[in-house]
Amino acid sequence: MTEMSEKENEPDDAATHSPPGTVSALQETKLQRFKRSLSLKTILRSKSLENFFLRSGSELKCPTEVLLTPPTPLPPPSPPPTASDRGLATPSPSPCPVPRPLAALKPVRLHSFQEHVFKRASPCELCHQLIVGNSKQGLRCKMCKVSVHLWCSEEISHQQCPGKTSTSFRRNFSSPLLVHEPPPVCATSKESPPTGDSGKVDPVYETLRYGTSLALMNRSSFSSTSESPTRSLSERDELTEDGEGSIRSSEEGPGDSASPVFTAPAESEGPGPEEKSPGQQLPKATLRKDVGPMYSYVALYKFLPQENNDLALQPGDRIMLVDDSNEDWWKGKIGDRVGFFPANFVQRVRPGENVWRCCQPFSGNKEQGYMSLKENQICVGVGRSKDADGFIRVSSGKKRGLVPVDALTEI
């Protein structure tokens, strides 16, 4: 500062002794120095602290350098970028994240209802009431199979349709997961349940697995017998269950022998139970307990497999039942083949019954107790004793009646 004051005083002294022509030049130099100092103060005060430190080191100069160097004109403010310059990428000290374009929204899939005649009792999705009637009962969605009344379709038609569910899961449910395992406990189950996109367990799967496990537990603990859905109500009233778990027809006499051909493969080699002594009947009861609730069925119709895990059926095939936890699709075994088949395609063959094939068509009067049969139709004889007039009582599916013995051939 002393140097600056001395330098500023020197022109004053010189101005007193200098001629008038040089006075104006000295005043200009003083004015330039004054403007130079003011420009530095203006820069330091006007610039904010953030902008001041963002400037490069080459642009910053010490105050002594600013005072000692000749004045430099201030750079003009940068003009706004033109349209041609906007296309060029200019680096910025703090770049802002460029927003990504939004993904195209998928169209919402709505229900596609069509008229449907419901053969079974189906509740409405909206009012939860049963859909009843003979014709034009209600509507059902093509994709998700949701059932609604005609008057309830307007409110639910605007809702989103979840789409078609997996065919194998809907048909077979969770039966394949529980076949070769003991009855599982739902709380300690180690199965890997199917999870959705959000990682949550499917509630339908949990409900089905819980019901299946309860059915297996009840069957193993109480030895409950499984019956074919094709049996009529009157036929169930005539059947009684003995202590060993086998079922006999009440129409048979107490002296009639029950042939164990269709109960288990190991029992077909031995004679009837009436020929055995009481001491020899103990192994049979043990064998019956080991086999469990596996019964013999006969195929009534031909079934072609629709999936890899289906079991092909031919009329007259003998099937050993493995799992009947599902109402519509059962799991059975024919020789070395194991798979699923429709439950209404087979009929239960109980001890004492024979399987017959119709060798010639027969037309009978239903009101008189006769049953009509087509050629090669499979039926099961209810009793072993033939009627006096040459007729035998048989059943095929839900039909039941008398058929002449000449029209049947035992399989």
From Swiss-Prot:
Plays a redundant role in promoting the expression of calcium channel CACNA1S at the cell membrane, and thereby contributes to increased channel activity. Slows down the inactivation rate of the calcium channel CACNA1C. One of its GO terms (biological process) is positive regulation of protein localization to plasma membrane. This is SH3 and cysteine-rich domain-containing protein 2. Changing residue 347 to I: No effect on the structure of the two SH3 domains. Residues 219-232 have a biased composition (Low complexity). Residues 1-29, 64-95, 174-203, 219-288 are annotated as: Disordered. CDD domains: C1_Stac2, SH3_Stac2_C. It is a peripheral membrane protein. Keywords: Cell membrane, Cytoplasm, Membrane, Metal-binding, Phosphoprotein, Repeat, SH3 domain, Zinc, Zinc-finger. The keyword Cytoplasm applies. Changing residue 306 to L: Mildly decreased affinity for CACNA1S. The gene is STAC2. One of its GO terms (molecular function) is zinc ion binding. The modification Phosphoserine is found at residue 48. Residues 292-351, 354-411 form the SH3 domain. Residues 70-82 have a biased composition (Pro residues). Residues 19-29 have a biased composition (Polar residues).
